[in-house]
């Protein structure tokens, strides 16, 4: 096949993203394909500010943040064996996987 496969991983837990990326790289390398990555993409931080009191005290506020972590993996010179191995791979439920061929 020898086409480029790009895998993007996204999660709110950086440990899950790193373990998933490591698992994918290990699986792909065992099939003989060339892998670049995992490349860490910028972390997005979303900040929410809410009032502590439901009625008064506008000055009393609380802030919450949600961080999303991303990794990028490129696979070159893949074969049907590589794609079969990726299809059978089980990843944690907290990781969003986007694959582009």
Swiss-Prot record:
Xref: PROSITE patterns: RIBOSOMAL_S10
Record's GO cellular component terms: ribonucleoprotein complex; ribosome
Keyword annotations from UniProtKB, A to Z: Ribonucleoprotein, Ribosomal protein
Gene3D superfamilies found in the cross-reference section: Ribosomal protein S10 domain
Gene Ontology BP terms: translation
Entry GO MF terms: structural constituent of ribosome; tRNA binding
InterPro entries noted in UniProt: Ribosomal_uS10, Ribosomal_uS10_CS, Ribosomal_uS10_dom, Ribosomal_uS10_dom_sf
Domain of life where this protein originates: Bacteria
Xref: SUPFAM superfamilies: Ribosomal protein S10 (SSF54999)
SMART domains in the record: Ribosomal_S10
Pfam families: Ribosomal_S10
Task of the protein: Involved in the binding of tRNA to the ribosomes.
Entry's family note: Belongs to the universal ribosomal protein uS10 family.
Subunit relationships: Part of the 30S ribosomal subunit.
Protein name listed in UniProt: Small ribosomal subunit protein uS10
Gene name as annotated: rpsJ
């Amino acid at each position: 096949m020898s086409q480029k496969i790009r895998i993007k991983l996204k999660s709110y837990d950086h440990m899950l993203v790193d373990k998933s990326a490591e698992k994918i790289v290990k699986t792909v390398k065992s099939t003989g394909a060339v892998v670049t990555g995992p490349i860490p993409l910028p972390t997005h931080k979303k900040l929410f500010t809410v009032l502590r009191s439901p009625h008064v005290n506008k000055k009393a506020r609380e802030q919450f943040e949600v961080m999303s972590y991303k990794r990028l993996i490129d696979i070159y010179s893949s074969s049907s064996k590589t794609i079969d191995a990726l299809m059978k791979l089980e990843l944690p439920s907290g990781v969003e996987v986007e694959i582009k061929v």
